[in-house]
UniProtKB/Swiss-Prot annotation:
Family statement: Belongs to the phosphatase 2A regulatory subunit B family.
Quaternary structure (record): PP2A consists of a trimeric holoenzyme, composed of a 37 kDa catalytic subunit (C subunit) and a 65 kDa constant regulatory subunit (A subunit), that associates with a variety of regulatory subunits (B subunit) such as phr2AB (B55) and psrA (B56 homolog). The trimer may partially dissociates into a core 'AC' dimer equally active compared to the trimer.
GO BP annotation list: myosin filament assembly
Entry-linked Gene3D superfamilies: YVTN repeat-like/Quinoprotein amine dehydrogenase
Region (Disordered): 132-152, 421-443
Primary site of residence: cytoplasm
Covalent S-S links between cysteines: none
Per-repeat ranges for WD: 22-61, 88-129, 206-244, 255-295, 314-352, 369-410, 449-483
Claim: Repeat is one of the keywords in the record: yes
Protein name per Swiss-Prot or TrEMBL: Serine/threonine-protein phosphatase 2A regulatory subunit phr2AB
Keyword Repeat: yes
GO molecular function: myosin phosphatase regulator activity; protein phosphatase regulator activity
Source organism of the structure: Dictyostelium discoideum (Social amoeba)
Length: 483
């Protein structure tokens, strides 16, 4: 059995705690870019915060833990109002996805409930005209002379409205006129470099229901967006049209039995995508089979004994998030109580089922009354698919091993960050700690604060580094192998 990784707290970005968290600063989206050098964080106020990893030698000598610093922040979405439906459209960022880098510019997709935007983020040099530099001697054809000695055979004429004048004669008489000897030439210099974000494309008026997912294709040119009943295929360079690839809306809405909860493209096969439903099923679609993929290529569903069904069965079986492993071999799904790992070649049952918080089953009535039972927890895998991450209540986050029963439980809290504090900007803070992981058996349901929850998480594409969002704060944890 492999030794568990030694997870340590690395950094935190955000506010001062749940009690001080304003609604606009709550974090609903976190995403690493393809290199892992950037982290994008979206908040409920429509802003996107970008963090950049530092690679300076001095920081690496002091600590082996990775360090991220503030890079940029911009307003992605504004609150809107749909006058046709008399509905307010929140500015909250639902999802963020990084696009392939082009030249020195970063590109990313952001979406709220209705509108998707493609942003270009780049470093812009602000130039200014510096103080004029004084140069002695006349200028001819752009060259500067250090003195006023010229060849006798070289005569230069200048023309104006009064006619031609011999410039050599003027130069001989310039000893009494310093204004002709001293030329002030302005110089253009770079004053500063600022990070600028500009919207390149706006994709809108395609979704009648709230957008819950966006996923970039492996071809780097297309992506899908899904709402409760439809999935659309877009081209990044065309925002005037899209193609509907899945439509589960019935003719009569009274016959509606399920909704789409999440969708994602295959990491390597550009024609394959999957989507999950509120019935607990995962369906695989193939764009080569037909333009409209209502007839799925595969369906992943686990049989449930009818005798075990209850009033809450359908609610807790609804899948809140799905992820492909980076090689496309496995599918990770999360519902309210469990985390399931599926083999793409085996549809009838998952290869691994993990009970996240089985101790909450007796409290389902209470969770239904306070609406916690409808919370949507995200999940993710590491770069080789051997580690799985998801969140829970009381700001707990669980890291599971695919090949064993290892469960590393960490608590994302401010109490873990008292040892060292360093202010980076007015909007961010960096803290370090060595708090030991919590044992899962030490968790007591009666002591759990259900207002504290880690719903959103992301894993570095190459390293053992995770980012989780709790209220208005982002926590970073890094791990090393025990020796």
């Amino acid at each position: 059995m492999t030794e568990p990784l030694d997870w340590r707290f690395s950094q935190t970005f955000g506010g001062k705690g749940n009690e001080d968290a304003s609604d606009a600063n709550v974090v609903p989206a976190i995403e690493f870019d393809q290199t892992g050098d950037f982290i994008a964080v979206g908040d409920k106020g429509g802003k996107v915060l970008l963090l950049k990893r530092t690679h300076d030698k001095q920081s690496s000598k002091k600590s082996k833990l990775p360090e991220y610093r503030f890079y940029s922040e911009f307003q992605s979405h504004e609150p809107e109002f749909d006058y046709l439906k008399s509905l307010e459209i929140e500015e909250k960022i639902n999802k963020i996805k990084w696009c392939p880098k082009q030249n020195d510019a970063q590109f990313l997709l952001t979406t709220n409930d209705k509108t998707i935007k493609l942003w270009k983020v780049y470093e812009k040099k602000i130039k200014q005209v510096s103080t004029s530099a004084t140069t002695t001697g006349p200028s001819y054809n752009g060259s500067l002379a250090s003195n006023n000695t010229r060849s006798p055979s070289h005569t230069t004429y200048i023309y104006n409205s009064s006619g031609a004048h011999n410039m050599n004669n003027n130069m001989n008489n310039s000893n009494n006129n310093n204004n002709l000897n001293n030329f002030k030439i302005p110089k253009l210099t770079t004053r500063e470099t600022v990070v600028t974000a500009t919207p390149r494309k706006i994709f809108q008026n395609a979704h009648a229901y709230h957008i819950n997912s966006i996923s970039l294709n492996s071809d780097g040119e297309t992506y899908i967006s899904s709402d409760d009943l439809r999935i659309h295929l877009w081209n990044l360079n065309i925002n005037t049209e899209c193609f509907n690839v899945v439509d589960i809306k019935p003719t009569n809405m009274e016959d509606l039995t399920e909704v789409i909860t999440s969708a994602e493209f295959h990491p390597t096969s550009c024609n394959i995508f999957m989507y999950s439903s509120s019935k607990g099923t995962i369906k695989l679609g193939d764009l080569r089979s037909s333009a409209l993929c209502d007839n799925h290529a595969k369906v992943f569903e686990e049989y449930e004994d009818p005798s075990n069904k209850s009033f809450f069965s359908e609610i807790i079986s609804s899948i809140s998030d799905i992820k492909f492993s980076r090689d496309g071999r496995y599918i990770l799904s999360r519902d309210f109580l469990t985390l399931k790992l599926w083999d793409i070649n085996m549809e009838n049952k998952p290869v691994k089922t993990i009970q996240i918080h089985d101790y909450l089953k007796p409290k389902l009535c209470d969770l239904y009354e306070n609406d916690c039972i409808f919370d949507k927890f995200e999940c993710t895998l590491n770069h080789d698919g051997t580690q799985m991450l998801t969140g829970s209540y009381h700001n707990y986050l669980h890291i599971y091993d695919r090949n064993s029963k290892q469960d590393v439980c960490l608590e994302a809290s401010k109490q873990a960050t008292k040892s060292k504090t360093k202010t980076l900007t007015t909007k961010m803070k960096l803290r370090s700690s060595k708090k030991e992981p919590k044992k899962p058996e030490d968790i007591h349901p009666d002591a759990i604060e259900y207002t504290k929850k880690t719903l959103h998480c992301a894993w570095h594409p190459k390293d053992n580094l995770i980012a989780v969002g709790a209220a208005n704060t982002v926590y970073l944890y890094a791990a090393t192998e025990n020796k």
